[in-house]
């Protein structure tokens, strides 16, 4: 019986799955929005939301726990210095998963994963940076 197994295998070995979710977590924390398949997005939520909850309580022990899961100093610094204070008053639900159509090659359902309360970027700023 398959009772109470709350993990998608995603057709990967456990080490590959761990590395993939770690890389996706780092990308999401760095860029604050990523595009991926829907099952990966749902698994990513289970990884990132507890990390942001850790970032709300800045202590050395929490930083070490976050570094143990992310293995990237820049991501841990952003988690505790930017994202923790941003979500200080929110009791959970830090991510938004938007369905994004289907991938051209294999028709896999795609999703856009983004952090809530992202600072808005004006289009004029992007044009000025490009020039």
From Swiss-Prot:
Taxonomy, superkingdom: Bacteria
PROSITE patterns the UniProt entry points to: RIBOSOMAL_L17 (PS01167)
Pfam families: Ribosomal_L17 (PF01196)
GO CC term, one of those recorded: cytosolic large ribosomal subunit
UniProt GO molecular function: structural constituent of ribosome
GO biological process entries: translation
Keyword Ribonucleoprotein: yes
Keywords for the protein's UniProt record, in alphabetical order: Ribonucleoprotein, Ribosomal protein
SUPFAM superfamilies: Prokaryotic ribosomal protein L17
UniProt-listed HAMAP family: Ribosomal_bL17
Quaternary structure and partners: Part of the 50S ribosomal subunit. Contacts protein L32.
Family indicated by similarity: Belongs to the bacterial ribosomal protein bL17 family.
Protein name: Large ribosomal subunit protein bL17
Protein's organism: Burkholderia multivorans (strain ATCC 17616 / 249)
